[in-house]
């Protein structure tokens, strides 16, 4: 290394590039999760492909400049916004493929069962090139069936799973034990990631 430090590249294992850099548009004054979700929901209808590309490219440049060589980004879609952000993130994955490895997670932020049409979009996202299947059982009902469905999709496409899991203030309604049991039952050990587990 000629007197310099040589280390493997760093990994950003959980980011939402399609929703990054929006705090200046509508601030989260309370700093709470509830307001963050509310503010983001208000802003999402204003996102265009050009807007997402500009913001996500800025984020990519920041990550690359700080030594990140592998990124897993959750990219959402639903019937009201379509694939605006998701398609843009897939485009950036291709554009930056010689610089950074990007894994795109098909992420149903608004739930699958409570948002009709999202289940079909999950399959479409996998066909479009998603690298992993996302889940958010705490924001859907019934939560265990949400977990079952995303496993079904992951198995169909032989992809890993990445869950936003039990992101709440209390322990009521937690599904992490069910998720662990399901992971073992399906032989998916080592292929399931969990984030936001705060209960």
Model-inferred region functions:
Residues 4-6, 23-74, 80-95, 120-127:
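Alpha-helical scaffold segments that flank or form the walls of functional sites
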Residues 39-55, 105-117, 136-140:
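Active-site mouth loops of central-metabolism enzymes
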Residues 74-79, 108-110, 139-140, 167-168:
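Conserved short loop/turn motifs at secondary-structure junctions
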Residues 84-98, 115-199:
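Histidine/acidic residue-rich metal-binding segments in metalloenzymes
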Residues 4-25, 168-169:
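Di-metal (Zn2+ and/or Mg2+/Mn2+) metal-binding site signature of metallo-dependent hydrolases
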